[in-house]
UniProtKB/Swiss-Prot annotation:
Example of a GO MF term: ATP binding
Biological or metabolic pathway of the protein: Amino-acid biosynthesis; L-arginine biosynthesis; L-arginine from L-ornithine and carbamoyl phosphate: step 2/3
Record-level GO BP terms: argininosuccinate metabolic process; L-arginine biosynthetic process; urea cycle
Subunit structure: Homotetramer.
Subcellular location: Cytoplasm
Swiss-Prot/TrEMBL catalytic activity: L-citrulline + L-aspartate + ATP = 2-(N(omega)-L-arginino)succinate + AMP + diphosphate + H(+)
Annotated organism of origin: Synechococcus sp. (strain JA-2-3B'a(2-13)) (Cyanobacteria bacterium Yellowstone B-Prime)
Binding site for L-citrulline: 89, 125, 129, 177, 186, 262, 274
Name recorded for this polypeptide: Argininosuccinate synthase
UniProt record similarity statement: Belongs to the argininosuccinate synthase family. Type 1 subfamily.
InterPro entries recorded: Arginosuc_syn_C (IPR048268), Arginosuc_syn_N (IPR048267), Arginosuc_synth (IPR001518), Arginosuc_synth_CS (IPR018223), Arginosuc_synth_type_1_subfam (IPR023434), AS_cat/multimer_dom_body (IPR024074), Rossmann-like_a/b/a_fold (IPR014729)
Chain sites annotated for binding L-aspartate: 121, 125-126
Length: 400
């Protein structure tokens, strides 16, 4: 008896997910495989991927467009949260996984499948993200993960696919594992596994090397409404157009490269290369606008929330009650995060050079050291005495 009758497979057209189709049918006795490819702005020829799944043995090959949903339902909340895993990674790949899982569950329910499947291995984070998201959305569905169990080396996996007539795109001269969507691009494996070796330029695709960036900086004004980016340089833009334009501009100036040693949930460290031009600029600009419009206490408290929020996304807990509760807090903080931030993009750096908001808490008459100073300097002495009183009493007791 097979492990399932009908399975919906998250399909990318790569080695592992392509091999999953014959493996599910011939090794695990699955009667029918429905391949689901999701358009996340990766720029792939989805018609070719759709046809490849059918050649590999899928009974159906479906494509779902989800670029808009990825940005509005996943990236925008992350921007409001200034979400950076370990203070560096803006979660471009991790944010896409709960969306793919949601679509897997929806299609499985539509076609009457009793299981869903993915091509994640047993060493990565994505297996956790898929399994937990699917369980949260439909705990009755089985989750199959052939690549986690089949025990084949990369070479054996390729050979298995070739046995069933599946063309393999990975070449020995380019052995990187790539993930791409409109939020960013990740690369790992190959020579990148040498943590002490500088990544070759061929690893990058969205950003220019510093030597090839323009000598003159570019300036861009980003408009936010309640923490959501809505326009560039005075022009209102939809989410997709905004990301496309900012990815192009920031990438041209070499902005958004990340080379980091990352702590995976499964307990290992991994060397990851990310390119997230627009997402990094937006998070930085958003934080600058918050500095202008939020109170000190809210900003300082939100730092801890942002760290937890980022960890939840990274660790596959997007659909958890805690993430939803934190979202409620974050949304409440964003009511006044409306305004415009001016960023300078130059030689790999994005620097804020101006910010304005109708809800600005910055008061020049209180901040100035020149004429027009309205700060009551006489109040400082009493404030300092009361503020330091506990320390003063402690010192009297312990130091005489």
């Amino acid at each position: 008896m097979g492990r399932a009758k009908k399975v919906v497979l998250a399909y990318s057209g790569g080695v592992d997910t392509s091999v999953c189709i014959p493996y599910l049918k011939h090794e695990w006795g699955v009667e029918s495989v429905v391949a689901l490819a999701v358009d996340l702005g990766q720029g792939a020829e989805l018609e070719a991927i759709q046809a490849k799944a059918l050649r590999a043995g899928a009974e159906q090959s479906l494509v779902r467009e989800a670029v808009q949903a990825l940005i509005t339902d996943y990236a925008f909340p992350a921007i409001q949260a200034n979400a950076l895993y370990e203070q560096r990674y803006p979660l471009s790949t991790a944010l896409a996984r709960p969306l793919i899982a949601k679509l897997l569950v929806e299609v499985a329910e539509e076609v009457g499948a009793d299981a869903v499947a993915h091509g994640c291995t047993g060493k990565g984070n994505d297996q956790v993200r898929f399994d937990l998201a699917i369980a949260a959305l439909n705990p009755q569905l089985k989750v199959l993960a052939p690549a986690r169990e089949w025990g084949m080396t990369r070479e054996e996996t390729i050979a298995y696919g070739e046995r069933y007539g599946i063309p393999m795109p990975v070449q020995k001269s380019s052995p990187y594992s790539i993930d791409l969507n409109i939020l960013g691009r990740s690369a790992e494996a190959g020579i990148l596994e040498d943590a002490d070796r500088e990544p070759p330029e061929e690893v990058y695709a969205l950003t220019r090397p510093i030597s090839q960036t323009p000598d003159e900086p570019a300036y861009v004004e980003i408009e936010f409404e309640q923490g959501i980016p809505v326009g560039l340089d005075g022009q209102r833009l939809g989410p997709k157009a905004l990301f496309e334009q900012l990815n192009s501009l920031a990438g041209l100036h070499g902005v958004g490269r990340i080379d980091m040693i990352e702590n995976r949930l499964v307990g290992i460290k991994s060397r990851e290369i990310y390119e997230c031009p627009a997402l990094m600029v937006l998070i930085q600009a958003h934080r600058e606008l918050e500095s202008l419009t939020l109170t000190r206490d809210v900003i300082h408290y939100k730092y801890g929330i942002e760290t937890t929020y980022s960890q939840l996304i990274y660790n596959g807990l997007w659909y958890s009650p805690l993430r939803e509760a934190l979202d409620a807090f974050i949304r409440a903080t964003q009511k006044s995060v409306t305004g415009v931030v001016r960023m300078r993009l130059h030689k790999g750096q994005a620097v804020c050079v101006g910010r304005r908001s109708p809800y600005s808490l910055y008061n020049p008459e209180l901040a100035t050291y020149g004429e027009g100073d309205q700060f009551d300097h006489r109040a400082a002495e009493g404030f300092i005495y009361i503020w330091g009183l506990p320390t003063r009493v402690w010192a009297q007791v312990h130091r005489g």
